[in-house]
UniProtKB/Swiss-Prot annotation:
Source organism of this protein record: Lactiplantibacillus plantarum (strain ATCC BAA-793 / NCIMB 8826 / WCFS1) (Lactobacillus plantarum)
Disulfide partners: none
Name the UniProt record assigns to this protein: Enolase 1
Keyword line: Cytoplasm, Glycolysis, Lyase, Magnesium, Metal-binding, Secreted
Binding annotation for Mg(2+): 242, 290, 317
Active site, per annotation: 205 (proton donor), 342 (proton acceptor)
Cofactor(s) required, per the database record: Mg(2+)
Listed pathway(s): Carbohydrate degradation; glycolysis; pyruvate from D-glyceraldehyde 3-phosphate: step 4/5
Residue ranges, annotated region (Binds human collagen): 73-140
UniProt main location, coarse: cytoplasm
Disruption phenotype: About 6-fold less binding of bacteria to human collagen.
């Protein structure tokens, strides 16, 4: 048993230049762990609370000194003395100390920083990689990456309503090969955008945010980029996209207002919008759609899942917010067939693991994800392997805070050697073989 002796938090910066919480944790044996907390731009309204100072004279109100103080003055007093390897007890103690359902008192950013630092210190204490500590000897599945290469919606200033357009190297044989395929496609995409006179400046997650004309043009350009890189769309590299539909849902009319449809924009009922998505699925090698409808319209999600869920992966992000209560509701209602996992949506590693396990037991896939405001912390790369989750969403082929996760995955694959497994399209166990074959044959 190794006792936690010291916990210290400080304010550092994320990839957008905004403050975030960094926590360092030490044990009596000298083991050490550090955790840095990410932050989202497009956030679900039911996420755990990210505590910000609100002082407009400092970082435009985005400072996190309150969260830092909560670690140094409150959480440290509670957690010092705990066995560093008892992750569940540490996380539950912080949840109890907070005492709110959404971690509003201490802040999920304070709690998560300690949770990650404790896990890393425990791995250091036991002299094992983090993925082994979290997942045990059976941690061996390397994830298929979702690489966000074109941005729209809240992540860009253009006429594209959907927030993210991603490539997934489903035909690769290893994560190293998948990353190479993604990199080659990314650079060919850049060349195509240059040829068409579009900007190749990159956004928060490393993807391009060109001023595209409508919602279909990104799919056309991605297919061209995949082919120019020497790969077959669908068979080698499939396409995924995140609608982030809550961002363009009109609560007053109950319709989805899309500026990228028609000459002057167009509004759709839920049924009409799902029909539009269905037509995209039929036309392009789509393997996954995230947040196709507003996060509060569960009955519409049922309808969408019934129509699209046998064809493609339907991912709940804002819908589930990595929360087992919402996920259990979705499973019971037959809503979605996949969950996006973001550690800061729920606030502890213990609760994150519980959400992944619940999803897998129900036949849902679990996609471990970054946030738009990231850091050099690579915990999610270890977590996705630890849980054999099989899919990771961690940005494009640019920006060091994104590449750091890919580099860590390649290190892990090297460490696992012949015991590692990359499943590609076969990791979509939420789709039957016929659906997978349809996607890879387009």
């Amino acid at each position: 048993m190794s006792i936690i002796t010291d916990i210290y938090a400080r304010e550092v910066l994320d990839s957008r230049g905004n403050p975030t919480v960094e926590v360092e944790l030490y044990t009596e044996s000298g083991a050490f762990g550090r955790g840095i907390v990410p932050s989202g731009a497009s956030t679900g309204e039911h996420e755990a609370v990210e505590l910000r100072d609100g002082d407009k004279s400092r970082f435009m109100g985005k400072g996190v000194t309150k969260a830092v103080d909560n670690v140094n003055k409150l959480i440290a007093k509670e957690i010092v003395g705990y066995d560093v390897t008892d992750q569940r007890a540490i996380d539950q103690a912080m949840i109890k100390l907070d005492g709110t359902p959404n971690k509003a008192k201490l802040g999920a950013n304070a709690i998560l920083g300690v949770s990650i630092a404790a896990a890393r210190a425990a791995a250091d204490e036991l002299e094992m990689p983090l993925y082994n500590y979290l997942g045990g000897f059976n941690a061996h599945v390397l994830p298929t990456p979702m690489m966000n290469v074109i941005n729209g919606g809240a992540h860009a200033n253009n006429d594209v309503d959907f927030q993210e357009f991603m490539i997934m190297p489903v035909g690769a044989s290893s994560v190293k090969e998948a990353i190479r395929m993604g990199s080659e496609t990314f650079h060919n995409l850049k060349a195509i955008l240059n040829e068409r006179g579009y900007s190749t400046a990159v956004g928060d997650e490393g993807g391009f945010a060109p001023d595209l004309k409508n919602n279909e043009e990104p799919f056309e350009i991605l297919v061209e980029a995949i082919e120019r890189a020497g790969y077959k769309p669908g068979k080698d590299i499939a396409i995924a996209f995140d609608c982030a539909a809550s961002e363009f849902y009109n609560e007053e009319t109950g319709k989805y207002d899309l500026k990228g449809e028609g000459e002057n924009g167009q509004s759709f009922t839920a049924e009409e919008f799902v029909d539009l998505l269905d037509s995209i699925v039929d036309k392009y090698p789509i393997v996954s759609i995230e947040d196709p409808l507003d996060e509060n319209n569960w009955e519409d999600w049922q309808m969408a899942t019934a129509k699209l869920g046998k064809k493609v992966q339907i991912v709940g992000d804002d819908l589930f917010v990595t929360n087992t209560d919402y996920l259990a509701k979705g499973i019971k209602m037959g809503v979605a067939n996949s969950i996006l996992i973001k550690v800061n949506q729920i606030g502890t590693l213990t609760e994150t693991v519980e959400a992944i396990e619940m999803a897998k037991e129900a036949g849902y896939t679990a996609i471990v994800s970054h946030r738009s405001g990231e850091t050099e912390d690579t915990t999610i790369a270890d977590l996705v392997v630890a849980m054999n989750a099989g899919q990771i969403k961690t940005g494009s082929m640019s920006r060091t805070e994104r590449i750091a996760k890919y580099n860590q995955l390649m290190r892990i694959e090297d460490q696992l050697e012949s015991t590692s497994e990359y499943k590609g399209i076969h990791g979509f166990y939420n789709l039957d073989e016929a659906a997978r074959n349809t996607i890879t044959s387009k």
